[in-house]
Design a protein with these regions (language model features):
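Long, well-ordered, tryptophan-enriched scaffold segments
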Residues: 30-44, 221-380
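Non-catalytic terminal/interface segments that mediate subunit docking, oligomerization
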Residues: 324-325, 329-451, 457-467, 524, ...
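Thiamine diphosphate
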Residues: 152-292, 302-309, 440, 460-492
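Glycine-/acidic-rich phosphate or pyrophosphate-binding loops and their flanking alpha/beta elements
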Residues: 278, 305-308, 340-341, 373-390, ...
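Peripheral docking tails and interdomain loops at the edges
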Residues: 350-358, 480-482, 501-502, 631, ...
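N-terminal amphipathic, basic-rich helices that act as targeting or association modules
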Residues: 6, 30-126, 286-289, 296-300, ...
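Structural signature of the thiamine diphosphate
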Residues: 262-331, 468-474, 492-542, 684-696
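Cofactor-binding active-site loop characterized by glycine-rich and histidine/acidic residues
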Residues: 88-209, 376, 393-394, 399, ...
């Protein structure tokens, strides 16, 4: 056979040296077929078995050897597809064997698979009739980044956030039992997602309900970053003991010595381990689950045997498998954090490339043309390090988003002041509250979409007590390819109604830095919201300043002062730049030369600059327009409406036209951030169209 350019010398699970090309003959062994790839193909690879599959029913007749060939073809296809479209990468490569085994054994979609988070569902999409559409994933009008019920009957539950699968699967199981429908429900959850309290709430109830539920714990020692905490150490103990709870033909647990699996080099977390663990030493067994594992999640014959027997066991069952994030692609195995997700490759027509070099080239090209533009997460990271060097009371908390929130440097410089609490948003918020009662000043770095999960704690444990906690809210606004599940478009609505909360929205990197400082220095509960991605290129003027709380700034005025139509455009956050571009174009158009537009950078959502709002009446403003990257209902514009209509006597008399521009009352589908903004009428052209309609 001819050597494939995509394979290299590697080690299989049994330690056998591999240098063989992709094969389709059933005589190949498991060890021979488990390939490691070094390169991402630029052209569509040959995948004859995969190409013949239109749905899970097509693999039911496959032999075990054919399934193992399919695994290699699927892995190679996902490498190619990721290079074409980008997307979540490492998690998908790690569950290919499991995905194939589940669809082979289960009668999907009659039997139902629930994927936690959904980062790992690309292979599932391919096997369920979406192979030819995978190149559109995360693109406008293409496949979604996560399982979505509206996309396929095989996507049994919509996901995107963590730790929801067992609750959803339990609900399905109980409903099926009530309707006397004997179907299997399998929940696939990672060890990172297992750190979320919701997962344990569901497991507790599953035992209480004695539900027939199959939970598969995909343990790769990672979420986006490395898994941490006591639960992670417990899983390591189960692995490092050298024993496993196997399953007999009768379904009974059997404690036995685990075969040596050289493919895994687990982190050693314990200086001493017990020789032989007892079943009662197992957390899942103690809760009341029937536990089997740990098993090699990349061994197809083993997976088929174990899952086939486990799904016949009544009651809640957990099968614990070990996998490698980025399995089969050497650079991703070596750097699972860096390869959690990738951008699509450059468009040059290269047959194959060394992806480590390609990744460096992408990074270089990304930095070119952007000057010194920083990501907002980098601005936060710089502020955090600068302030911590001056104030030893600063402590920083994140729920498993060290890299994404820009906290790597802080964690290295101040490890004793950095607290990654894993995927536990509720705990993160109340933890900060507890810290604040002892005289320190905690900052909680959290994505807007995930702050939703800690809302009760924010009200009850922070704001009600007016505790000195600052929330650095990243990914506020539309987030692009991750779509509606990750959009940060509700935070203003649920924050500004909470007493004692101050809320700031910076227009650029410099304001972000100084508003973070302003909120940190304030004695009370505060929040600064900022978007995903890079800023405008504004330089940060150090040292850190304190802005006046509740003060807006008139940024610019366009159009003649004698114009009969005077429009005040109240822009919140990064929409200031959009407002200025729109106003400049609008007033330069001869059609609108009877209009003057002043751009007001509101800076603060709460408190509003009510003094400035009152002066607008004195200036004879005829139109007031608010502009925000947030839902209109309950957002910053609503706050302006409430003040003008209920608390301003002057406006009760003059009654200027009031108009709100923001995100409409619908979930915004995935696409690029620019496409999403255009979809909502929040790009420059969209804002101009809306202003023209208002002025006409």
């Amino acid at each position: 056979m001819q050597q494939s350019p995509y394979f290299s010398q590697s080690q299989s699970a049994s330690g056998t040296s591999l240098s063989k090309p992709l094969a389709t003959d059933s005589a190949a062994s498991f060890s021979d077929l488990q390939q490691t790839f070094m390169q991402i193909p630029r052209t569509r690879p040959s995948t004859p078995l995969l190409d013949a599959i239109d749905g899970p029913s097509d693999i039911k007749s496959f032999t075990t050897d054919q399934l193992m060939v399919l695994v290699d073809e699927l892995r190679l296809f996902l490498l190619y597809s990721a290079g074409q479209s980008g997307g979540h990468f490492g998690a998908n490569l790690g569950v290919i064997e499991l995905t194939v085994a589940l669809h082979y054994l289960l009668d999907t979609p009659n039997d139902q698979i629930v994927w936690d988070v959904g980062h790992q569902a690309y292979a599932h999409k391919v096997l369920t009739g979406r192979r030819d559409q995978l190149g559109t994933i995360r693109s406008k009008d293409g496949l979604t980044a996560f399982p979505e019920r509206a996309e396929s009957v095989y996507d049994t539950f919509g996901v995107g956030h963590s730790s929801t699968s067992i609750s959803a699967g339990l609900g399905m199981s109980l409903a099926l039992r009530y309707q006397e429908r004997p179907q299997t429900v399998a929940c696939v959850i990672g060890d990172g997602a297992m750190t979320g309290g919701m997962a344990f709430e569901a497991m507790n109830d599953a035992v209480q309900q004695d539900a027939d539920l199959l939970v598969i714990l995909n343990d790769n020692d990672m979420s986006i970053s490395c898994s941490i905490g006591g639960f992670s150490r417990h899983l390591a103990m189960l692995w490092e003991s050298g024993y496993q709870v196997d399953i007999s033909e009768s379904g009974a647990p059997i404690l036995c010595q685990r075969p040596n699996m050289q493919a895994f080099d687990r982190r050693k977390r314990h200086s001493a381990l017990r020789d032989v663990p007892q079943l009662e030493d197992n957390l899942f067994k103690a809760i009341g689950f029937t536990y089997f594992g740990p098993f090699d999640g990349h061994n197809i014959p083993e997976l088929l045997r174990v899952l086939s027997l486990a799904k016949q066991v009544s009651g809640p069952v957990l099968v614990h498998i070990y996998t490698t994030k980025g399995k089969g692609f050497a650079p991703a195995e070596a750097d699972p954090v860096g390869y959690h997700a990738i951008s699509k490759l450059p468009a040059e027509d290269i047959v194959a490339c060394d992806f480590a070099q390609e990744k460096a080239a992408i990074a270089s090209k990304t930095s070119e043309g952007k000057g010194s533009k920083l990501k907002y997460s980098q601005v936060f990271g710089q502020f955090l390090c600068d302030k911590a060097a001056q104030d030893d009371k600063l402590l920083a908390i994140t729920p498993a988003m060290e890299e994404g929130s820009g906290m790597i440097d802080f964690a290295r410089q101040f490890p004793e002041r950095f607290f990654d609490v894993a995927i536990a948003e509720q705990h993160a918020v109340t933890l900060a509250g507890g810290m604040a009662t002892q005289g320190v000043k905690p900052i909680v770095a959290i994505y807007s979409t995930f702050l939703q999960r800690g809302y009760d704690q924010l009200i009850h444990d922070i704001a009600l007590q007016n505790l000195d906690v600052t929330f650095a809210i990243d990914r506020a606004g539309l987030v692009g390819e991750d779509g509606a599940t990750h959009a940060g478009v509700f935070d203003l609505a649920f924050l500004r109604c909470v007493p004692n909360m101050l809320i700031a929205a910076p227009k650029d990197e410099n304001e972000c830095y100084h508003l973070l400082n302003t909120c940190y220095e304030y004695q009370g509960s505060t929040a600064v919201r900022y978007p995903r991605g890079t800023g405008t290129g504004a330089m940060i003027n150090r040292p850190a300043q304190q802005y006046q709380i509740g003060q807006a700034i008139v940024e610019s005025v366009f159009g003649p002062g004698h114009a009969p139509k005077k429009l005040a455009l109240l822009a919140f956050g990064t929409m200031v730049a959009t407002a200025e571009q729109a106003a400049k174009r609008l007033t330069s158009d001869n059609v609108n030369n009877d209009c003057q537009v002043q751009i007001i950078n509101m800076r603060w959502v709460k408190p509003l600059d009510t003094h400035l709002l009152e002066t607008l009446n004195e200036q004879g403003v005829t139109h007031i327009v608010t502009l925000e990257e947030h839902v209109i209902m309950g957002g910053a514009g609503s706050a302006v409406n409430e003040y003008l209509l209920n608390a301003s006597p002057a406006f009760a008399i003059s009654r200027p036209a009031i108009y709100n521009i923001g995100i409409p009352d619908r979930f915004i589908a995935h696409g690029s951030q620019a496409e999403q903004l255009a979809d909502c009428g929040l790009d420059v052209d969209g804002v101009i169209r809306q202003l023209q309609r208002l002025l006409s």
